[in-house]
From Swiss-Prot:
Gene that produces this protein: btb3
Protein name, as recorded: BTB/POZ domain-containing protein 3
Disulfide-linked positions: none
GO biological process terms held by the UniProt record: proteasome-mediated ubiquitin-dependent protein catabolic process; protein ubiquitination
Any one of the GO CC terms: nucleus
Length: 523
């Protein structure tokens, strides 16, 4: 609540933090807080004008949780920064009343501290009491650092014995044996790339004679294990191993403040570095060892350290079981009762173009990928086939690319059929809204009529009075477009007033009714 002191002309802002707690700030206090914060921090809440951050802000305005999750978790887009208008993603989400987005941002480290300008602004601007209570009750220590699936998989490659069939190098020390992967360590460290390149094809074991525990701790660090232990007792050994492996960022932070190795920010930095390292390694493989299937007399590919192949319509790629197992489809093929599980170098087929297959590889190796709009529909199909269809997975990324287009590159009919075939609600809503906005151009199209019939046939044992999903969706988006609410409608589904908007709405509803009569359908 805001009030003004009549004697001094000072505006006060009252913020309620509970049933009995109140705190008053003059506008000068708030301005002072903002200036103090700006001086104290060079990275927190600084202006970020990158395209990814602006897309995050826009998604928070709209309440598009799927896009927000994708940008934060797949692309590591920062959330504690502001756009050119000084709005952070959390402020935008709370201001626009999107509770699921607010909850997600808080769980992923968004700051809302009551004694800061951005925190007070977020609380004061919250659209409803539910969001305000969520912000007030939230303690930053409650932040859920949910195991990111990508990082979790990388860690499990070292720690999960069920995935040891993907390993090809063993480090044997006095405390036991550690199973690892040549390709992964070669991608993360130039030392290992050089070391493994000198090993013969039958050499799969290296003896660790000294500091075996410290060596294992460094390996766990490289595999993103958050429980890697770095003891004070062997500082020199850890630093020596780090220097040998050329882990300059690890050495710098360990010497400065080793406790930061377990901080949230450092984990995000290492996750991004791992994605970058594996992305560069994959680019190297594609550039040097991608082979047309009509000429499989391949060049030497010993530096790819592969243990499988992935084959598109036209090309074959050396790949790694450890990464392919991120996909349940390939995991079943490589670990289940199938021929591929018994082959030394199995060939996994993916019946799509090389461009689409390379998008799949990029996603599996890095958890992110750039998808050209003209390929996005095929990517939705391949992601559905491979069961890469969970939140912020490959199907989600491809769907976002399609729905960002004002004018679709593919046929809107193909997009809707793809949505039906792959159970993708985001695409279905996009196609229905597009059809509602362009109804006058589509209503006489024979293919549109056929699509309405298909929608009617999607209801098993359809009765005469059952609704048609596509028609219901189009009617919904028409009412949303023209601002017509259910209580405004007459019994026949139209409005009885004659404002220009309502008149146009009635015309479009009549067009739909005429089409249904023509098709002898009721909905």
């Amino acid at each position: 609540m805001a009030s003004q002191d009549q004697n001094t002309g000072t505006t006060h802002v009252e913020l309620q933090g509970g049933e009995n707690s109140k705190k008053l700030f003059s506008k000068y206090d708030l301005w002072s807080k903002a200036m103090d914060e700006k001086k104290l921090s060079s990275s927190l809440f600084t202006v970020n004008d990158t395209q990814e951050f602006l897309e995050l802000c826009e998604a928070c305005r709209r309440g598009d949780l799927e896009v927000v999750k994708s940008l934060v978790e797949n692309y590591n887009t920062p959330i504690n920064q502001v756009d050119q208008f000084d709005y952070s993603p959390l402020v935008l989400a709370s201001l626009c009343g999107h509770e699921p987005v607010v909850k997600f941002l808080l769980e992923n480290g968004a700051l809302c501290e009551r004694d800061t300008f951005q925190g007070e602004r977020c609380l004061y601007g919250a659209l409803n009491d539910n969001i305000r209570r969520m912000l007030l009750s939230y303690d930053i220590t409650k932040a859920i650092d949910e195991s990111q699936p990508y990082a979790s998989h990388i860690t499990s490659l070292l720690s999960n014995s069920a995935l040891h069939f993907t390993t090809d190098i063993v480090f044997a020390g006095q405390y036991g044996r550690v199973f690892a992967h040549k390709f992964y360590l070669a991608a993360r460290s130039s030392y290992f790339k050089s070391k493994f390149s000198k090993l013969g094809p039958s050499e799969h074991e290296i003896e660790v004679k000294h500091f075996a525990k410290e060596f294992e701790s460094i390996l766990r660090y490289l595999y993103l294990d958050t429980n890697a232990v770095f003891t004070k007792q062997y500082n020199n050994a850890l630093l020596s191993i780090g220097k040998k492996f050329q882990l300059n960022d690890f050495i710098a932070l360990y010497e400065k403040d080793r406790e930061q190795l377990h901080s949230r920010d450092w984990k995000k930095i290492q996750l991004a570095k791992t994605q970058n390292d594996l992305g560069e390694f994959l680019d190297y493989i594609i550039s040097n060892y991608k082979v047309p299937i009509e000429s499989l007399n391949q060049p030497s590919d010993q530096y790819s350290f592969h243990d499988a192949y992935l084959q598109s319509y036209t090309h074959r790629y050396p790949v790694h079981r450890a990464i392919m197992c991120r996909c349940e489809y390939f995991l079943d093929m490589l670990a289940g009762p199938f021929l591929e599980s018994n082959q030394e170098l199995p060939v996994l087929s993916l019946p799509f173009s090389s461009s689409v297959v390379e998008i799949v590889l990029k996603f599996l190796y890095t958890d992110k990928t750039d998808i050209a709009p003209e390929l996005a529909l095929d990517v939705v199909y391949v992601a559905d086939m491979l069961s890469l269809d969970k939140d912020r997975s490959l199907k989600s990324l491809a769907s976002i690319v399609i729905t960002k287009q004002e004018e679709p590159i593919d046929s809107i009919y193909d997009i809707l059929r793809t949505a039906w075939d792959t159970s993708t609600p985001r695409l279905e809503q996009y196609a229905s809204e597009y059809m509602a906005n362009h109804l006058e151009h589509l209503i006489d199209d024979p293919e549109f009529c056929e699509l309405v019939k298909e929608s009617a046939d999607r209801i098993l044992q359809r009765q005469e009075t059952d609704t048609i999903e596509l028609i219901d969706d189009i009617r919904y988006f028409l009412s949303k477009r023209f601002g017509i609410y259910h209580e405004d409608l007459c019994i026949d589904g139209v409005v009885d007033t004659l404002t220009p908007y309502e008149s146009e709405y009635n015309q479009k509803m009549e067009m739909i009714d005429d089409l249904l009569d023509k098709l002898e359908l009721q909905a």
